Amino acid sequence: MTRDSGKPIVTVLTAPGDAEPPGLDALRAQAEVRFASDEATLNEALPGTRVMMVTDFRTEALAAAWPKADRLEWIHATSAGVDALMFPALTDGPVKVTNAQGIFDRTIAEYVVCTILMFSKDFPNSIRLQQNHQWKHRDTERAQGKRVLIVGAGSIGRQIARLTAAIGLKPHGIARAAREHDPDFEAVHGNDSLTEQLELADFVVVAAPLTAQTEGMFDRAAF
């Protein structure tokens, strides 16, 4: 592997078996681009690397190969969540970590709306009946007026609130602190109200980041 090109080194960490991310041609003109997909290949690629792009949001390879990161300055995750990157050697050091905040808000919100409608309109049984050539009329539920509890009132949760409200649902949020008069939620309740709010919800959406504070919040009492 060339190590004296004079260009800054960028290492791309993908999940094993994933294809090379598109759109890297322009980057290659300005940097030496290396690829890794597991601990072994990352151990080889990391020395001299100044920038990393991580597309595998479940990776454990970086924590294992961290001693090889002798020049690393910046890690960019192409996902919204970065919990796999939050190991002590990284969080306690000077390396900057960024993510793709905002990129997936609309996509995830559309998926949530689709799933709510799927359950309300009983799509699985409709598909099963069609596959069996059974043309059976059934009554389904209306989503309008139902209460959806969105745990996590950040950018993703806020977009979910907007889209669910657009089809007539009543979005309520859970956040670290309660607040009144939110433009996108019927109300935003504090974390200490989770169990109470779960009892009132028709649908529950978890859009909170996985952190030390949120891990385990859906415990036995919540379920």
Regions flagged by a language model, labelled:
Residues 47-48, 71, 199-200:
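Alpha-helix C-terminal capping/helix-to-coil transition sites in glycosyltransferase folds
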Residues 166-183:
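NAD(P)-binding Rossmann-fold cofactor-contacting core
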